[in-house]
């Protein structure tokens, strides 16, 4: 039975990240979303019970490191 096996999680790459990479990560979680999408710049936000836990702009140096850590500890994975 492989019905309960979930696919490996995608995480943000080192350095800056693209809109497509942010979408791929956000699509895996119930509480991770893209906000303030300005085309080339966007903010990825992690929430818990509706309150912001962490946020990072896609151009922020080192932002992906803290976002990945926060998503790992606070992300609520969508069921497949």
From Swiss-Prot:
Classification of source organism: Bacteria, Pseudomonadati, Pseudomonadota, Gammaproteobacteria, Enterobacterales
Protein name per its UniProtKB record: UPF0401 protein YubL
Pfam family, one: DUF905
SUPFAM superfamilies: YcfA/nrd intein domain (SSF54786)
Similarity section: Belongs to the UPF0401 family.
Disulphides: none
Xref: InterPro entries: DUF905, YkfF-like_sf
Key words of the record: Plasmid
